[in-house]
Amino acid sequence: MMRLYYFLSFLLLPIYFVIIFIRLLIGKEDIRRVKERFAIGKHRQDNRFLIWIHAASVGESMIALNLVDNISKHFPEVRFLVTSWTQSSAKILSTKLPKIATHQLLPIDNIIFTKIFLNNWKPDLGIFIESELWPGTINEAAKQCNLLLVNARMSDKSFESWKKRKGFFQLIVKNFSEVIVQSERDLQKFNELGISNTTNLGNIKFANEKLPVNQEELIKLSEHLKNKQVILFASTHPEDEEIILPIIKNLKKQVIDCYIILIPRHPERIKSILDNCIAQDLSATAKSQNDLPVLTDDLYIVDRFGEMGLFFSIASISFIGGSFKQGGHNILEAAHFSNCIIFGPDMSKNTDIAKGVLQSKAAIQIKSGEELLNMLEYLLDPNNSRELKNYQENSLKFVERNQKILDEYLQIITKFFP
């Protein structure tokens, strides 16, 4: 089966080049770094123990940063290679990784580029985060070092798909020395697919450290918005904005002192978002146009990476994007800042976190734009200020209770150290 995969990936090599070229044209690749997709780039510098961590996108990248930080505290001699796939994660990792770590884009999953990449780096331990499984890369890497799959999760859709290709799934995942899943539900799915070397430690995102905040910026922003109730729409997709933008006018009519801030999941969409605002008769300014919100505008759009923590710091309520159709994003980043958290009907990629925060009365789930509008108006009514405060306090308590998970992950990871 793996030989067939290698053969097909070799035949598809010309198509890979076309795909990368198209991604360049639409802004999903950085021309300065595109060579890394073909394993042309940096290489290992010394013989110190090297841990390779692969983080597909932004959420996984935050976990990778946390792992690098905590492992290096206990093992300062260890060095790290962190790979990712998306440009958004690349920008975050390139700016936030410490000097003991190097970031590189993951090469295309083709045996030629994979072997060059592994020969350049020769990792001593590989850690893959969550659910991105590149068959060729994993199979070749397992020949060189132990591999761990951490915070593993599987959506119901993926589970049904893998059941039809159970043998191939086993061929990939059995390359991992340990599989650490994030919930009992995920454990059952992996076991049913024939993977027995699994452990459920819970979701390591529970243990993610608080997002960094520029204190000078925070003071300036807080002073600027001191008389406003800030509502943050975080990590939004076009499908979220189709629902959010039409309710903003009504919300601002009902709640005079509220101010809306929107942070798209992909800031490169800023032009289309501004165009949609105009179509909805909304006045909006992007952060790239003005460092501070224009108070007479209907909303402020943050089109820069790495500033989520700053805006969680000033928000009273945060709606977490991707929760109408994309399966949801990380709720817990907002919980660290004691926000009242709201999310939509689709949390299929974060089922257990969603269930946990709802049971703890640390978040609110809505089903539609109308429900969202009604809930925001209700929470911002001065008569309901105590209820709003309870949600804010409960969100922080929830995330604080789960900090021990990281220590349990590190106990397993460090078993594979020399």
Curated annotation (Swiss-Prot):
The lineage of its organism: Bacteria, Pseudomonadati, Pseudomonadota, Alphaproteobacteria, Rickettsiales. This is 3-deoxy-D-manno-octulosonic acid transferase. It comes from the Bacteria. It is an enzyme of class 2 (transferase). It is found in: Cell inner membrane. GO terms for cellular component: plasma membrane. The active site is at E60 (proton acceptor). Its main location: membrane. Belongs to the glycosyltransferase group 1 family. Glycosyltransferase 30 subfamily. It comes from Rickettsia bellii (strain RML369-C). CMP binds at P264, R265, F305, G306, E307, N330, I331, L332, E333. GO terms for molecular function: Kdo transferase activity. Pathway: Bacterial outer membrane biogenesis; LPS core biosynthesis. It catalyses: lipid IVA (E. coli) + CMP-3-deoxy-beta-D-manno-octulosonate = alpha-Kdo-(2->6)-lipid IVA (E. coli) + CMP + H(+). InterPro entries: Glycos_transf_N, Glycos_transf_N_sf, Kdotransferase. The record marks E130, K205 as: Transition state stabilizer. One of its GO terms (biological process) is lipid A biosynthetic process. It is a single-pass membrane protein. The chain crosses the membrane at residues 7-27. Gene3D superfamilies: 3-Deoxy-D-manno-octulosonic-acid transferase, N-terminal domain, Glycogen Phosphorylase B. Its EC number is 2.4.99.12. Involved in lipopolysaccharide (LPS) biosynthesis. Catalyzes the transfer of 3-deoxy-D-manno-octulosonate (Kdo) residue(s) from CMP-Kdo to lipid IV(A), the tetraacyldisaccharide-1,4'-bisphosphate precursor of lipid A. The keyword Transmembrane helix applies. Keywords: Cell inner membrane, Cell membrane, Lipopolysaccharide biosynthesis, Membrane, Signal-anchor, Transferase, Transmembrane, Transmembrane helix. The keyword Coiled coil does not apply.
